[in-house]
């Protein structure tokens, strides 16, 4: 089943799960400020698998995707293809674990290729990224976005300004095929990630110890 925890306490979530005989949970999109889910994990009442949030205990497994290298690779291809030097990087949410990892990849790229980079938060929002691009993209050579949705917003801003800048995204979502402009992105295999997460939940429910999976 799918479950959204917004507005609920850890105790309310626990009661809801127990009433439905739920004993294993896969958690996506957890932020550093999500105290409710962090408490749920600490209490160890459920077998938990967290995707892209570095938390491990005896009842919790962490599935880590190499966000840093993936961001590095897609941005490097875009930068080198167009001989860019000045980068506008539109990052995700400030409190996101993946935001830190992807930004780390960008900082490594800037150092390796002797680039300059301006970083602005896009909050994984198409509209916010569009506004950032409208304000800053004109004086940059390339726009690198930490999600495809933000890349779409940035591209729409460039179209509105009638200027060309290469844009790349991250995730490989289906919508990228409908933008009308070619953009680099990196596909995340959500099906394989989710399948592995379910396998890990079953292992925990059968007495396995929590660990990190890359």
Q: Where are each of the predicted segments found?
A:
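Hinge/beta->alpha junction and helix N-cap segments in small-molecule ligand-binding domains
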Residues: 3-10, 63-73, 89-111, 115-132, ...
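Flexible loop/turn connectors
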Residues: 135-142, 146-214
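Short hydrophobic/aromatic-enriched beta-strand-loop microsegments
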Residues: 47-51, 116, 162-170
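Structural motif
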Residues: 24, 86, 141-142
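Glycosyltransferases and closely related glycan-assembly transferases
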Residues: 39-46, 107-112, 154-164
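Glycine-rich phosphate/diphosphate-binding loops that line cofactor/substrate pockets in enzymes
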Residues: 77-87
């Amino acid at each position: 089943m799918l479950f959204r925890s917004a507005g609920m306490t850890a105790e309310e979530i626990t009661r809801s799960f127990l009433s439905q005989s739920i004993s294993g949970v896969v958690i996506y999109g957890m932020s550093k400020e999500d105290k409710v889910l962090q408490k749920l994990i600490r209490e160890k009442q459920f077998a938990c698998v967290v995707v892209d949030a570095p938390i491990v205990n005896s009842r919790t497994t962490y599935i880590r995707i190499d966000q840093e290298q993936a961001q590095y690779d897609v941005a490097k291809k875009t930068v080198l293809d167009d001989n860019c030097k000045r980068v506008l990087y539109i990052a995700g949410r400030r409190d996101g674990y993946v935001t830190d990892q992807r930004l780390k990849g960008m900082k490594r790229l800037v150092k390796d290729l002797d680039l300059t980079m301006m970083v602005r938060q896009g909050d994984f929002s198409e509209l916010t990224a569009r506004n950032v691009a409208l304000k800053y993209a004109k004086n940059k050579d390339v726009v690198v976005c930490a999600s495809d949705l933000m890349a779409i917003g940035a591209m729409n801003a460039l179209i509105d300004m009638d200027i060309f800048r290469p844009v790349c995204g991250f995730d490989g979502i289906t919508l990228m095929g409908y933008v009308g402009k070619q953009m680099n992105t990196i596909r995340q295999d959500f099906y394989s990630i989710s399948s592995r997460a379910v396998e890990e939940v079953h292992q925990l429910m059968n007495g396995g110890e929590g660990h990190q999976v890359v």
